[in-house]
Amino acid sequence: MKIYRQIKQSFSITKIVFSFFISLLLNLVAQPTICQAFPIYAQQAYQIPREATGRIVCANCHLGKKPVEIEVPQAVLPNTVFEAVVKIPIDKGAQQIQANGQKGPLNVGAVLMLPEGFKLAPAERLSEELKAKTAGLYFQPYSADKENILVIGPIPGDKNQEIIFPILSPNPETNKNVKYLKYQLHVGGNRGRGQVSPTGEKTNNTIYNASVNGRISEITKLENGGYEITITTKNGESKIETIPAGPSLVVKKGQTIKADQPLTIDPNVGGFGQMDTEIVLQSAGRVQGLIAFFISVVLAQIFLVLKKKQFEKVQAAEMNF
Protein backbone atom coordinates (compact mmCIF):
# COMPACT_ATOMS: atom_id res chain seq x y z
CA MET A 1 0.00 0.00 0.00
CA LYS A 2 2.86 2.36 0.87
CA ILE A 3 4.59 1.63 -2.45
CA TYR A 4 1.32 2.32 -4.29
CA ARG A 5 1.03 5.72 -2.60
CA GLN A 6 4.61 6.60 -3.49
CA ILE A 7 4.03 5.63 -7.11
CA LYS A 8 0.80 7.64 -7.18
CA GLN A 9 2.51 10.68 -5.62
CA SER A 10 5.43 10.42 -8.06
CA PHE A 11 2.98 10.21 -10.97
CA SER A 12 1.16 13.32 -9.73
CA ILE A 13 4.39 15.32 -9.49
CA THR A 14 5.41 14.19 -12.97
CA LYS A 15 1.99 15.20 -14.30
CA ILE A 16 2.28 18.69 -12.73
CA VAL A 17 5.78 19.24 -14.12
CA PHE A 18 4.69 18.03 -17.56
CA SER A 19 1.67 20.37 -17.51
CA PHE A 20 3.90 23.31 -16.53
CA PHE A 21 6.28 22.74 -19.44
CA ILE A 22 3.40 22.31 -21.88
CA SER A 23 1.86 25.62 -20.69
CA LEU A 24 5.22 27.38 -20.97
CA LEU A 25 5.72 26.03 -24.48
CA LEU A 26 2.25 27.16 -25.56
CA ASN A 27 2.87 30.65 -24.18
CA LEU A 28 6.14 30.94 -26.06
CA VAL A 29 4.48 29.88 -29.29
CA ALA A 30 1.30 31.89 -28.91
CA GLN A 31 2.70 35.19 -27.67
CA PRO A 32 4.71 37.47 -29.99
CA THR A 33 8.17 38.46 -28.87
CA ILE A 34 8.91 42.05 -27.98
CA CYS A 35 10.95 42.54 -31.15
CA GLN A 36 7.90 41.65 -33.23
CA ALA A 37 5.27 43.73 -31.43
CA PHE A 38 6.75 47.20 -31.89
CA PRO A 39 3.64 49.17 -30.71
CA ILE A 40 4.35 47.85 -27.22
CA TYR A 41 7.51 49.96 -27.08
CA ALA A 42 5.60 53.23 -27.22
CA GLN A 43 2.84 51.93 -24.98
CA GLN A 44 5.32 51.01 -22.25
CA ALA A 45 7.51 54.10 -22.46
CA TYR A 46 5.11 56.98 -23.19
CA GLN A 47 1.81 57.99 -21.61
CA ILE A 48 0.69 59.41 -24.95
CA PRO A 49 2.40 58.73 -28.29
CA ARG A 50 2.58 62.38 -29.40
CA GLU A 51 5.09 64.87 -28.02
CA ALA A 52 4.36 68.53 -27.32
CA THR A 53 6.14 69.43 -30.56
CA GLY A 54 3.63 67.35 -32.52
CA ARG A 55 6.12 64.59 -33.24
CA ILE A 56 4.84 61.04 -32.80
CA VAL A 57 7.25 59.04 -30.64
CA CYS A 58 7.55 56.16 -33.13
CA ALA A 59 10.00 58.41 -35.01
CA ASN A 60 12.48 57.99 -32.13
CA CYS A 61 13.14 54.39 -33.20
CA HIS A 62 12.15 54.46 -36.88
CA LEU A 63 14.65 56.96 -38.30
CA GLY A 64 13.83 56.55 -41.98
CA LYS A 65 11.17 58.84 -43.42
CA LYS A 66 8.36 57.46 -45.55
CA PRO A 67 4.94 58.87 -46.51
CA VAL A 68 1.66 58.02 -44.82
CA GLU A 69 -1.85 59.22 -45.64
CA ILE A 70 -5.21 59.27 -43.89
CA GLU A 71 -8.69 59.69 -45.34
CA VAL A 72 -11.72 60.52 -43.19
CA PRO A 73 -15.09 62.11 -43.95
CA GLN A 74 -15.18 65.90 -43.88
CA ALA A 75 -17.97 65.72 -41.28
CA VAL A 76 -19.80 63.03 -39.32
CA LEU A 77 -23.01 62.91 -37.32
CA PRO A 78 -23.00 61.93 -33.63
CA ASN A 79 -23.19 58.26 -32.65
CA THR A 80 -22.38 57.03 -36.16
CA VAL A 81 -19.78 54.60 -37.48
CA PHE A 82 -17.36 55.82 -40.14
CA GLU A 83 -14.11 54.68 -41.76
CA ALA A 84 -10.68 56.17 -41.16
CA VAL A 85 -8.44 54.83 -43.94
CA VAL A 86 -4.69 54.87 -43.24
CA LYS A 87 -2.47 54.32 -46.27
CA ILE A 88 1.06 52.99 -45.76
CA PRO A 89 2.59 52.39 -49.20
CA ILE A 90 5.52 49.99 -49.50
CA ASP A 91 7.78 49.04 -52.38
CA LYS A 92 6.73 45.78 -53.98
CA GLY A 93 9.21 43.01 -53.33
CA ALA A 94 11.07 44.98 -50.66
CA GLN A 95 12.51 42.81 -47.88
CA GLN A 96 13.78 43.87 -44.48
CA ILE A 97 16.55 42.54 -42.27
CA GLN A 98 15.01 40.47 -39.50
CA ALA A 99 16.37 40.09 -35.97
CA ASN A 100 18.23 36.90 -36.94
CA GLY A 101 19.96 38.64 -39.85
CA GLN A 102 17.90 36.95 -42.54
CA LYS A 103 15.72 38.84 -45.01
CA GLY A 104 11.95 38.73 -44.74
CA PRO A 105 8.81 40.59 -45.81
CA LEU A 106 7.99 44.06 -44.51
CA ASN A 107 5.50 44.49 -41.70
CA VAL A 108 3.46 47.64 -41.15
CA GLY A 109 1.87 49.26 -38.12
CA ALA A 110 -0.05 52.41 -37.29
CA VAL A 111 -1.16 54.60 -34.41
CA LEU A 112 -4.31 56.72 -34.80
CA MET A 113 -4.97 59.55 -32.35
CA LEU A 114 -8.66 60.48 -32.37
CA PRO A 115 -10.34 63.41 -30.61
CA GLU A 116 -11.65 62.82 -27.09
CA GLY A 117 -14.88 60.82 -27.20
CA PHE A 118 -14.16 59.08 -30.51
CA LYS A 119 -13.30 55.40 -30.16
CA LEU A 120 -13.13 52.04 -31.91
CA ALA A 121 -16.59 51.00 -33.09
CA PRO A 122 -17.91 47.86 -31.35
CA ALA A 123 -18.40 44.78 -33.52
CA GLU A 124 -22.20 44.88 -33.23
CA ARG A 125 -22.25 48.36 -34.83
CA LEU A 126 -20.31 47.31 -37.94
CA SER A 127 -22.04 46.71 -41.25
CA GLU A 128 -21.37 43.48 -43.12
CA GLU A 129 -19.27 45.43 -45.62
CA LEU A 130 -17.15 47.00 -42.88
CA LYS A 131 -16.75 43.62 -41.15
CA ALA A 132 -15.36 42.21 -44.39
CA LYS A 133 -12.95 45.14 -44.80
CA THR A 134 -11.57 44.76 -41.27
CA ALA A 135 -11.50 40.95 -41.15
CA GLY A 136 -8.28 39.62 -39.65
CA LEU A 137 -7.23 42.99 -38.19
CA TYR A 138 -6.81 43.45 -34.45
CA PHE A 139 -7.05 47.00 -33.15
CA GLN A 140 -6.36 47.87 -29.53
CA PRO A 141 -6.54 51.05 -27.45
CA TYR A 142 -3.22 52.63 -26.54
CA SER A 143 -4.06 52.19 -22.85
CA ALA A 144 -7.06 51.48 -20.65
CA ASP A 145 -7.80 55.20 -20.22
CA LYS A 146 -6.95 56.19 -23.81
CA GLU A 147 -9.75 54.66 -25.87
CA ASN A 148 -9.39 57.44 -28.43
CA ILE A 149 -5.84 56.35 -29.32
CA LEU A 150 -5.69 53.15 -31.36
CA VAL A 151 -2.72 51.02 -32.42
CA ILE A 152 -2.33 48.10 -34.78
CA GLY A 153 0.64 46.03 -35.88
CA PRO A 154 2.81 44.46 -36.82
CA ILE A 155 0.78 43.03 -39.71
CA PRO A 156 1.90 41.87 -43.19
CA GLY A 157 2.64 44.91 -45.33
CA ASP A 158 1.90 43.40 -48.73
CA LYS A 159 -1.75 42.81 -47.80
CA ASN A 160 -2.32 45.84 -45.58
CA GLN A 161 -1.10 48.93 -47.38
CA GLU A 162 -4.53 50.35 -46.55
CA ILE A 163 -5.75 49.87 -42.97
CA ILE A 164 -9.39 50.70 -42.29
CA PHE A 165 -10.17 51.77 -38.72
CA PRO A 166 -13.90 51.52 -37.87
CA ILE A 167 -14.61 54.56 -35.68
CA LEU A 168 -17.65 55.46 -33.58
CA SER A 169 -18.32 59.17 -33.17
CA PRO A 170 -19.47 60.49 -29.77
CA ASN A 171 -22.86 61.98 -28.96
CA PRO A 172 -22.71 65.42 -27.27
CA GLU A 173 -26.23 64.88 -25.98
CA THR A 174 -24.99 62.09 -23.69
CA ASN A 175 -21.31 63.09 -23.36
CA LYS A 176 -21.11 66.65 -22.05
CA ASN A 177 -17.33 66.75 -22.61
CA VAL A 178 -17.87 66.66 -26.38
CA LYS A 179 -19.04 69.62 -28.47
CA TYR A 180 -20.13 70.09 -32.06
CA LEU A 181 -16.79 71.37 -33.32
CA LYS A 182 -13.97 70.77 -35.77
CA TYR A 183 -11.37 68.36 -34.37
CA GLN A 184 -7.86 67.27 -35.32
CA LEU A 185 -6.73 63.70 -35.98
CA HIS A 186 -3.12 62.54 -35.95
CA VAL A 187 -1.80 59.37 -37.54
CA GLY A 188 1.60 57.72 -37.63
CA GLY A 189 2.48 54.77 -39.82
CA ASN A 190 5.64 52.77 -40.27
CA ARG A 191 6.86 49.94 -42.37
CA GLY A 192 9.74 47.71 -41.35
CA ARG A 193 11.75 47.40 -38.16
CA GLY A 194 13.31 50.29 -36.28
CA GLN A 195 16.93 51.38 -36.26
CA VAL A 196 17.13 52.12 -32.54
CA SER A 197 15.78 50.05 -29.66
CA PRO A 198 13.90 51.72 -26.77
CA THR A 199 17.07 51.43 -24.67
CA GLY A 200 18.97 53.54 -27.21
CA GLU A 201 21.00 50.71 -28.71
CA LYS A 202 21.28 50.15 -32.44
CA THR A 203 19.41 47.27 -34.04
CA ASN A 204 20.81 45.24 -36.91
CA ASN A 205 18.58 47.20 -39.30
CA THR A 206 20.79 50.26 -39.53
CA ILE A 207 24.17 51.45 -40.76
CA TYR A 208 27.31 50.95 -38.63
CA ASN A 209 30.18 53.46 -38.68
CA ALA A 210 33.76 53.44 -37.46
CA SER A 211 34.32 55.09 -34.09
CA VAL A 212 38.02 55.92 -34.61
CA ASN A 213 40.56 56.74 -37.32
CA GLY A 214 42.89 53.93 -38.28
CA ARG A 215 43.57 50.91 -40.42
CA ILE A 216 41.50 47.72 -40.52
CA SER A 217 43.90 45.05 -39.31
CA GLU A 218 41.45 42.16 -38.97
CA ILE A 219 37.91 41.13 -39.94
CA THR A 220 36.55 38.11 -38.10
CA LYS A 221 33.28 36.46 -39.07
CA LEU A 222 31.28 35.38 -36.04
CA GLU A 223 29.28 32.20 -35.63
CA ASN A 224 26.00 34.14 -35.43
CA GLY A 225 26.67 35.71 -38.82
CA GLY A 226 28.01 39.05 -37.63
CA TYR A 227 31.53 40.45 -37.75
CA GLU A 228 34.25 41.80 -35.50
CA ILE A 229 36.34 44.48 -37.19
CA THR A 230 39.64 45.35 -35.54
CA ILE A 231 40.83 48.89 -36.23
CA THR A 232 44.42 49.78 -35.34
CA THR A 233 45.02 53.47 -34.65
CA LYS A 234 48.23 55.45 -35.26
CA ASN A 235 49.11 54.98 -31.60
CA GLY A 236 49.00 51.20 -32.03
CA GLU A 237 45.82 50.80 -30.02
CA SER A 238 43.19 48.36 -31.23
CA LYS A 239 39.48 49.13 -31.35
CA ILE A 240 37.02 46.32 -32.04
CA GLU A 241 33.78 47.19 -33.82
CA THR A 242 31.07 44.54 -33.48
CA ILE A 243 28.63 44.26 -36.38
CA PRO A 244 25.51 42.13 -35.81
CA ALA A 245 24.15 39.69 -38.36
CA GLY A 246 22.39 41.41 -41.22
CA PRO A 247 24.22 44.47 -42.61
CA SER A 248 26.76 43.76 -45.36
CA LEU A 249 30.29 45.13 -45.05
CA VAL A 250 31.60 47.85 -47.38
CA VAL A 251 35.18 47.74 -46.06
CA LYS A 252 38.00 45.23 -46.31
CA LYS A 253 41.12 44.22 -44.44
CA GLY A 254 44.02 46.66 -44.82
CA GLN A 255 41.78 49.61 -45.64
CA THR A 256 42.44 52.97 -44.00
CA ILE A 257 39.30 54.56 -42.60
CA LYS A 258 38.22 57.65 -40.72
CA ALA A 259 35.91 58.07 -37.75
CA ASP A 260 32.22 57.99 -38.70
CA GLN A 261 33.03 56.33 -42.02
CA PRO A 262 30.45 53.62 -42.88
CA LEU A 263 31.54 50.07 -42.23
CA THR A 264 28.31 48.57 -43.62
CA ILE A 265 25.57 49.40 -46.06
CA ASP A 266 22.32 50.88 -44.75
CA PRO A 267 19.98 47.85 -44.85
CA ASN A 268 16.86 49.78 -43.87
CA VAL A 269 14.15 49.75 -46.54
CA GLY A 270 11.35 50.97 -44.28
CA GLY A 271 10.51 54.17 -42.52
CA PHE A 272 7.99 56.17 -40.54
CA GLY A 273 5.65 58.98 -41.48
CA GLN A 274 2.90 61.01 -39.85
CA MET A 275 0.03 63.20 -40.97
CA ASP A 276 -2.64 65.44 -39.45
CA THR A 277 -6.18 66.00 -40.68
CA GLU A 278 -9.48 67.44 -39.46
CA ILE A 279 -13.03 66.21 -39.00
CA VAL A 280 -16.21 68.03 -38.03
CA LEU A 281 -18.68 66.59 -35.54
CA GLN A 282 -21.85 67.90 -37.10
CA SER A 283 -25.21 68.37 -35.38
CA ALA A 284 -28.16 66.73 -37.11
CA GLY A 285 -30.26 69.77 -36.18
CA ARG A 286 -27.77 72.06 -37.91
CA VAL A 287 -27.87 69.92 -41.03
CA GLN A 288 -31.66 69.97 -41.04
CA GLY A 289 -31.64 73.73 -40.50
CA LEU A 290 -29.16 74.17 -43.36
CA ILE A 291 -31.33 72.07 -45.66
CA ALA A 292 -34.40 74.09 -44.64
CA PHE A 293 -32.47 77.30 -45.33
CA PHE A 294 -31.46 76.13 -48.81
CA ILE A 295 -35.05 75.09 -49.56
CA SER A 296 -36.32 78.49 -48.43
CA VAL A 297 -33.75 80.24 -50.64
CA VAL A 298 -34.78 78.16 -53.65
CA LEU A 299 -38.47 78.80 -52.99
CA ALA A 300 -37.79 82.51 -52.59
CA GLN A 301 -36.00 82.54 -55.95
CA ILE A 302 -38.90 80.70 -57.59
CA PHE A 303 -41.50 83.09 -56.13
CA LEU A 304 -39.34 86.04 -57.19
CA VAL A 305 -39.22 84.77 -60.78
CA LEU A 306 -42.98 84.13 -60.81
CA LYS A 307 -43.65 87.58 -59.36
CA LYS A 308 -41.39 89.15 -61.96
CA LYS A 309 -43.20 87.37 -64.78
CA GLN A 310 -46.56 88.44 -63.32
CA PHE A 311 -45.38 92.04 -63.12
CA GLU A 312 -44.14 91.91 -66.72
CA LYS A 313 -47.52 90.62 -67.89
CA VAL A 314 -49.38 93.41 -66.06
CA GLN A 315 -47.00 96.00 -67.45
CA ALA A 316 -47.46 94.66 -71.00
CA ALA A 317 -51.27 94.74 -70.62
CA GLU A 318 -51.18 98.37 -69.46
CA MET A 319 -49.05 99.37 -72.44
CA ASN A 320 -51.45 97.68 -74.88
CA PHE A 321 -54.41 99.44 -73.22
UniProtKB/Swiss-Prot annotation:
Heme binds at residues 38, 58, 61-62. PROSITE patterns: CYTF (PS51010). Binds 1 heme group covalently. Keywords: Cyanelle, Electron transport, Heme, Iron, Membrane, Metal-binding, Photosynthesis, Plastid, Signal, Thylakoid, Transmembrane, Transmembrane helix, Transport. GO terms for cellular component: cyanelle thylakoid membrane. The keyword Cytoplasm does not apply. Its cofactor is heme. GO terms for molecular function: electron transfer activity; heme binding; iron ion binding. The keyword Signal applies. It is found in: Plastid, Cyanelle thylakoid membrane. Component of the cytochrome b6-f complex, which mediates electron transfer between photosystem II (PSII) and photosystem I (PSI), cyclic electron flow around PSI, and state transitions. The 4 large subunits of the cytochrome b6-f complex are cytochrome b6, subunit IV (17 kDa polypeptide, petD), cytochrome f and the Rieske protein, while the 4 small subunits are PetG, PetL, PetM and PetN. The complex functions as a dimer. This is Cytochrome f. It comes from Cyanophora paradoxa. The gene is petA.
